[in-house]
């Protein structure tokens, strides 16, 4: 132990009173022996070396495993799955609307899948197609720490079976997709709007929906309440034909998708003739 007389000679009294541990006292007693880090010699700078990673080999292991898994799923469900694709570390399978429930039930309950959580359900609008909507399901497997995407198709008149009986979390996702795109889900317990107001006209995320909407919401001083009025605009671009928009670029544009990843559009199932 350090004697009190030595501490009184080497350490000021004010510092000694504020020191609650012996380590602080020892450091204060030998401040001259401490090395000043700022005065140490610095190593000479060298050239920065960053290893080059080929983008095609970055996901090489994941792509091979996902291709095996996609092939395995197609071999188990050849009647329902039309095709599958792998992009980087993402696996997507394409099915017909009538196959949604069998495929989702398989992905949820099969031992090799265990995709028990639906993370998102959304859609994309392609007005030039016969089946203009791509309905997308994103699933998560906690057990295998993996994700999968399921895609199907629909239009304004053809509905899609609801997966709410399989996934309780799909309830609001399907309502949101119906509200914003107009995709109808058969078997949904409460299919009504969830994002827009009561009596809203149209579906905002469709490509043919005007950017200004159809009605104007404002507060009326005379009636002392919020009212809805039809818009009176003179813009020529307010009403445009299906498949065109004022925000489209000039020309067809360029498609940067690699040839190996371009997939044909799934064809709809042939209508079955009713037996007389």
UniProtKB/Swiss-Prot annotation:
EC number assigned by the record: 7.1.1.2
Region (Disordered): 248-276
Catalytic reaction equation(s): a ubiquinone + NADH + 5 H(+)(in) = a ubiquinol + NAD(+) + 4 H(+)(out)
Top-rank taxon, per record: Eukaryota
GO molecular function: NADH dehydrogenase (ubiquinone) activity
Any one Pfam family match given in the protein's UniProt record, by short name: Complex1_30kDa
Keyword Signal belongs to the record: no
GO annotations of cellular component type: mitochondrial inner membrane
SUPFAM superfamilies: Nqo5-like (SSF143243)
PROSITE patterns listed in its UniProt record: COMPLEX1_30K
Subcellular location: Mitochondrion inner membrane
Key words, A-Z: Electron transport, Membrane, Mitochondrion, Mitochondrion inner membrane, NAD, Oxidoreductase, Respiratory chain, Transit peptide, Translocase, Transport, Ubiquinone
Quaternary assembly: Complex I is composed of about 30 different subunits. This is a component of the iron-sulfur protein fraction.
Function: Core subunit of the mitochondrial membrane respiratory chain NADH dehydrogenase (Complex I) that is believed to belong to the minimal assembly required for catalysis. Complex I functions in the transfer of electrons from NADH to the respiratory chain. The immediate electron acceptor for the enzyme is believed to be ubiquinone. Essential for N-alkane assimilation.
UniProt similarity note: Belongs to the complex I 30 kDa subunit family.
Protein's UniProt name: Probable NADH-ubiquinone oxidoreductase 30.4 kDa subunit, mitochondrial
Organism phylogeny: Eukaryota, Fungi, Dikarya, Ascomycota, Saccharomycotina
